[in-house]
Amino acid sequence: MTTAAKVILACCLLGAFHIQISSSSAIPIWEFLTRNEKMSHLYSTFAQLVSVHCKSTAAVGGLPVNQCKHNLLGYGSAKLQTLSDVQLEALDPYQRDANELIWSSIMGDHPSGASLVTTRQPLQQPLPTPPASSLIILTRQQLPHGASHAHPIQSSGSATNPIFESGEQKHKYAMDMDKAYGYGPQSSSELPMAAALTSEPSKRFLTGPLVIRVRPDGSPVEEDKMMPLPRDEDLPYFHLGLAAAQPNRHRKIATISSLKQQHFASILQSDLQPPHQTQRRLFRQQQA
C-alpha cells in the first residue's frame, strides 16, 4: 500500500469518527447541560409556542390570550418538573421537529388535549375595501402582472405560518414572546403610500405638568406669565418629615475656639474658689 493510500484511508477513518460523535445530538453541548439549564431552555421554547398557540386560538372563539397563557404556562412549568433526565435528554430544542416534540411531551396529558396551532385562522368578516381614490387605483394598476406571482411560496408561507418569519429576528433579543412570530401592528388593505396620505395625524402629545412656550425668536410668551405654577405633590410630605425630625435633630458641633474658652473659664473659676479644706473647716464651725 502506497503512502497516498494510507493518508486517504486515515482521513476517511478520522472523518467517520467525527461524524459518529457529532450525530448523537444536533448541538453536542445539550448533553453537557445541567438539569436546570435544560429545563430553562425547554420552558423558553414552550413559552414561545404557547404565545403563538393562544394568539391563533383566540381568533376563533377560544379562551382569551392572557387566560390561555396563564393556564398553559402554569401546566407546562409543573410538567417539566416531573420529566426524568432521560426525557429531558431527548427533548433537544435544536433538533428537527423539536417544537412538535416538546409540545407533545408537555401537553400530551393535558385535560383539554390541545394540539399545537401555529397558523392564524381566516377572519370571519372580509377586510374593508380601500377608499376609491385615484392614487390607490393608479398605484395598483401600475404594478406588473408578474410581481404578485414572483414569490408565491414566500407570500403564502408568511400569511399562513407566522412562526417562521425570516425577515424579523426580534425573538432573539425581545422579552415579549408575542414579538417572536410577527404579531405586530394590524395589517391594512392600503398600500404604504396611500395609508400615509389617508391616515389621521397622531393626537397624543408628550406634555408634562409644566409647559414653557416660546416664540420663534426664543422669547417667552406673555400670556404664560400669568399662569399658576403646578402644585408640588411631594411638598406636604416633605414638611411633615421636617416637623417629625425637628425634636430629634442633633446639636451643632462645638468649634475648637469655643471649647478652649470653656476650658479656660472652668480653670479660672476653680482658681477663684477657696481650697477644699478651708471650706470644710468653715462648714464645721457653722454646724457647731
Swiss-Prot record:
Tissue-by-tissue expression: Expressed in head, but not in the body. Expression levels oscillate with the circadian rhythm.
Please list the GO biological process terms of this entry: rhythmic process
UniProt superkingdom: Eukaryota
Keywords, ordered alphabetically: Biological rhythms
Role played: Involved in the generation of biological rhythms (Potential). In the head, oscillates in abundance with a daily peak during early night, even under constant darkness. Oscillation is dependent on period (per) function.
- Know the name of this protein? Rhythmically expressed gene 5 protein
Tell me the name of the encoding gene: Reg-5
